[in-house]
Curated annotation (Swiss-Prot):
Transit peptide location: 1-70
Pfam families cross-referenced by the UniProt entry: SQS_PSY
Name of the featured protein: Phytoene synthase 1, chloroplastic
Role: Catalyzes the reaction from prephytoene diphosphate to phytoene.
GO cellular component: chloroplast; chloroplast membrane
Pathway assigned to this chain's UniProt record: Carotenoid biosynthesis; phytoene biosynthesis; all-trans-phytoene from geranylgeranyl diphosphate: step 1/1
Membrane topology: Peripheral membrane protein
Gene giving rise to this polypeptide: PSY1
Amino acid sequence: MSSSVAVLWVATSSLNPDPMNNCGLVRVLESSRLFSPCQNQRLNKGKKKQIPTWSSSFVRNRSRRIGVVSSSLVASPSGEIALSSEEKVYNVVLKQAALVNKQLRSSSYDLDVKKPQDVVLPGSLSLLGEAYDRCGEVCAEYAKTFYLGTLLMTPERRKAIWAIYVWCRRTDELVDGPNASHITPMALDRWEARLEDLFRGRPFDMLDAALADTVARYPVDIQPFRDMIEGMRMDLKKSRYQNFDDLYLYCYYVAGTVGLMSVPVMGIDPKSKATTESVYNAALALGIANQLTNILRDVGEDARRGRVYLPQDELAQAGLSDEDIFAGKVTDKWRNFMKMQLKRARMFFDEAEKGVTELSAASRWPVWASLLLYRRILDEIEANDYNNFTKRAYVGKVKKIAALPLAYAKSVLKTSSSRLSI
């Protein structure tokens, strides 16, 4: 269930993955060859730490709002204090926020006019425009709603978001695509090495070239990209999560990372009085909310794959087990359990809304639209009487269309759902 894209924050709703491509990339990752025989072919159609000092009040407040089951600080068997998943993730947030603040202090920094660093591209640099165009085609083909939202952005931001989307999609395809059975940890190691080269301005193919150009233009940190790959490693070896702390880390890896990747491109409103750190916290919260929504929507589908993406300790507290999920029967125990899970996801959406209002004007509308639509999936789960075993909750076309003017109003008025609602 490694849904990796949430319109950037949010394109998780649009993933319909295909392998990163069917032109030999898996073979290249498994071998020592430098180039795939058809590295620049079009994607085929198919399926879907520098440690800062911690604020104890921040840990306490987030734990209370989000309902984290475990304590913030945990003693290891050796007596050392281990960081909770939220703390580990927050360290990445601080690092990215510091990078953006450093760029903003530079008088030469302008998101839409800054010239990129030179990117070493196999062949002619004139292919860079074609690379971005291809990324746009992939978005249009597999994430139609998200793609339309990107058209509201400035041309430079739009292209950069396309490039990030495509990289996330290709990464997700490693473990969720048709070739997933051939992927090994070594293949992911090679994919990460390729990422490192990309950030050094040495892309492997034309789609990598678009992202290499993007990270040269914008203050995007490499750590969220590494962390997404770590999420793919987790999916290869893990199908159960003992508590919400474990699940939170997984959700960050496969979806929260996308928010950290994309906010430097989307930009923060110059008039915003919010701290950069708080905006990134909200972006992270939206990624977590989207992934939790995916998990709650796809319980039955995941169970048929032998996977349970629900906290084992909370299932036990509700008098439930994996066997109940595999049986697929909606009982009062299941309804009560689901009510608590939906409540938690909505709390993350609430936290995310605080940051959407602080984004640049050109980015707010598409993010609001995606947030509102994804949040409605939780309502549909309730409407299905919590039957997420045999029914897949989705938002119909009429409701999608109805959400657009509301999202626009929110983006203009810079308000949250507490003042406007569907």
